[in-house]
Amino acid sequence: MLAVGLLGLSAVIVPAAAAQPFACTAGERPLRFGFYTHFEPVSYSDSRTPGSAGFDTHRGYEADLLSALEAIEGAKLAFSRRGIAVWNGIWLLPAGSEFDIVGGGITILESRTRAADGKAAVVFTAGHIAFRQSLLVRKEDANRLARHGKLSGVDRVGVLAGTTGEARLLEITGIAGAAGVLAVGTRVVTPRGRVVADGGAGYVIAAAGASPSLAGRRQIRPASAGLPTVIVFTDDAEMVEALADGRIDAVARGEVGNRAAAREHGNAFAVTALDARAETGGFALAARNAALAACLDRHIGWLTDGGRIGYSEWFGDASVFMQRARQAAVGKR
């Protein structure tokens, strides 16, 4: 599973014939792990302000999973963690020189493995968490907006730019096709003015990225009067606040984040419109470090018991991954 001489980690990765087959590194330096700071409870920091005390303090589901990886005897895994506040293109950062691994509730998509030139840039580990898209609505609207199909032209739906929540909402409602191409006549409000989609490849909003002309988009107004207006946010807390004060009628986002917001706001919100399509989240590494990804897969597979332990189990007992790590250390593996 392990390889020699991976570019950028050649001093860290050990050969396949090494005496410790579980070792992912030579233990000479920590792996530089960048984590998204705004996805509570999956991946977040003590402080959302870059440069402040606590910004690089990793919390949540993925933080505990990483700590358990570090605790596996013989794996030789250590992570130096740094917070990342900007979501857009976060999965491509390991292709550069600043990070070895990046996480933050990133949905695994083949389209996210390629750079802008179409060349392979990153690989993902196997999935360690499952997501489903959903709507977060005010409790009094739960019946009216029980399904995506009930959204109408009077509704305004919030999304986070560049997420699967945005891309999937556009696809489900028919504002865009499966590849993210916007329907003819769709109007997009950007800082540079309004653009109108012609149904071609120059007007795309997908989870892996969007057309340059749509950068910084603020609103997506469908050509059909019967479809909802999409309000684009860059901060999830601001988006939930907009739902609370009535500026929008729903938040299109993964179930995990929406249920966390519903819990935080007591009886004010409800989660509806659970998507039948499942998504899986993993960690991103440079394509040249595929062997490291494979080694991580081995240990993540143990910690998650082959996918049987995930977010729900962690939410019930946040020590579940560390318990598995200790079992590995005492030879129960």
Spans of model-derived segments:
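Periplasmic-binding protein-like
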Residues: 36-39, 126-142, 190-195, 223, ...
